[in-house]
A protein has these predicted regions:
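Glycine- and acidic
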Residues: 35-41, 83, 139-147, 169-176, ...
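General structural feature for long, well-ordered alpha-helical segments within catalytic domains
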Residues: 48-51, 55, 59, 93, ...
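N-terminal entrance/gating region of PLP-dependent enzymes' catalytic architecture
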Residues: 2-4, 8-12, 23-172
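Active-site C-terminal subdomain of aminotransferase-like
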Residues: 328-407
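Conserved PLP-enzyme active-site core in the AAT-like
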Residues: 151, 184-187, 191-358
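Well-ordered mid-protein domain cores that form the structural environment of catalytic cofactors
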Residues: 124-215, 223, 229-230
């Protein structure tokens, strides 16, 4: 039996191979019989096309037969099916693999496209996004450096610019695609933390010297129904869950501006340091949008980082009828926006954007082998300089294809 390691070892030979194995039917033979036959390469295009055709057929069959969004199966009922699987022994061919997948996954998958599905914020997806997903998986670009992505870098940057223009963040804005709202919120609060800490006396900065003694006094203010990713972010940032101070909401489930003002005053009186205020544009449970303008003005008057979690409601930037609900976002220092929610994109597709691109320096590290500082000075657009990730999928392609084909 050949393994993944065997495939990697023979990659060089496979790239130039024209073996007969590569021309045979992809789902009627075993890929384990020849590591060369399993590699995506020019020699295996017939096999790739055959496999993609079969997978497309399977998806169509599944969607045509789905009667409800979810079967309701429990973990206890499904887990035994995995108990005796031997991952060291591959199945005989693609058809066998797909049959197994139907039983283990597709039969009980959650079908978000179904008109009766309303349980979560996951959305049905548009065709351009699905087509792009197939393309980006095949080409497999990594968006960390220019020399690995070229045009992909510029596509992503143009989409970031489009997003910040729609949000009204101004000409100094910038950002980066992320895996989702949780990562975007983490990144935004990291930037807020480091922006506050670099202003402290006798502290040379978090990146080189770690957190200052004052870090235990940093606080984040958000409504009592804001997303739990804020607590997770504060834990990861060394501040702890309790660094998030919940602010009361009004009868419309929006952050109460007066309650925020009181909370900020009380924190100052107790010697605490307001690090950031997070306004939610679309709460998970109610879809409520905090009074962004009032909160933004409060933050600006006090010199506090203003973050808008628009993971859910950010899609309103495309709405002529309802876009006014996001008025005030233009005052934000950072914004989270999930394209894989109200933009109908396949998971994952999200972004964290900032009003002042220089704040992105807090996530920058120059590695000589990858993104040396000289390249940055010369203007090479290495996206890793403003990302928490290094290797990163070309998820921006999904939104790009959608805008180019649908508008």
């Amino acid at each position: 039996m050949h393994s993944l390691q065997d495939s990697a070892a023979t990659y060089g030979a496979a790239a130039g191979s024209s073996s007969s194995d590569a021309q045979t039917d992809a789902y009627a033979r075993s890929l384990s019989s020849s590591p060369r036959a399993a590699l995506f390469s020019p020699a295996n295009m017939d096999a790739w096309q055959t496999g993609m055709d079969r997978i497309s057929q399977l998806v169509a069959e599944q969607l045509d037969s789905v009667q409800q969004p979810f079967s309701g199966i429990t973990p206890e009922a499904l887990r035994p099916a995995f108990a005796d699987l031997d991952l060291e022994t591959p199945l005989e061919n693609l058809e066998a693999g797909l049959e197994e997948l139907k039983s283990l996954y597709l039969k009980d998958a959650v079908y978000f496209h179904h008109p009766r599905y309303i349980a979560h914020l996951n959305c049905p997806v548009v065709l351009p996004g699905v087509w792009a997903e197939s393309l980006l998986g095949a080409i497999n670009s990594s968006l960390d450096t220019w020399d690995q992505s070229a045009g992909g870098t510029l596509i992503e940057q143009r989409l970031i610019d489009w997003t910040t223009e729609r949000l009204g963040l101004g000409p100094t804005a910038d950002g980066i695609f992320t895996s989702g709202g949780t990562q975007s919120n983490l990144m935004a609060l990291l930037l807020a933390r480091d922006a506050v800490c670099e202003k402290l006396p006798n502290h040379p900065g978090n990146q080189t010297h770690g957190l200052p003694p004052e870090a235990g006094r940093l606080r984040v203010f958000a409504s009592g129904i804001s997303h739990f990713s804020l607590q997770k972010a504060c834990a990861l940032l060394g501040l702890g869950h309790n660094a998030v101070i919940p602010v009361a909401v009004d009868e419309r489930r929006r952050m109460d501006h007066e309650a925020l003002r009181d909370a900020l005053d009380n924190a100052r009186a107790e010697g605490l340091i307001p690090m950031a205020v997070v306004a939610t544009a679309g709460t998970t449970d109610f879809g409520s949008i905090d009074p962004l303008q009032a909160i933004g003005r409060e933050c600006h008057a006090r010199g506090i980082w203003f973050h808008v979690d628009g993971a859910y409601g950010g899609g309103l930037i495309t709405s002529r009828r309802h876009g006014h609900w996001l008025k005030g976002t233009e005052m934000a220092d950072s914004v989270t926006i999930d394209y894989h929610k109200t933009f109908f994109q396949p998971v994952s597709c999200s972004a964290c954007v900032v009003r002042d691109r220089t704040q992105l320096r807090h996530v920058t590290y120059h590695a000589d082998y990858l993104n040396p500082e000289l390249q940055a000075r010369e203007g090479t657009p290495d996206q890793v300089n403003k990302s928490l990730q290094t290797t990163r999928r070309f998820d921006a392609l999904k939104l790009w294809m959608t805008l180019r084909l649908m508008g």
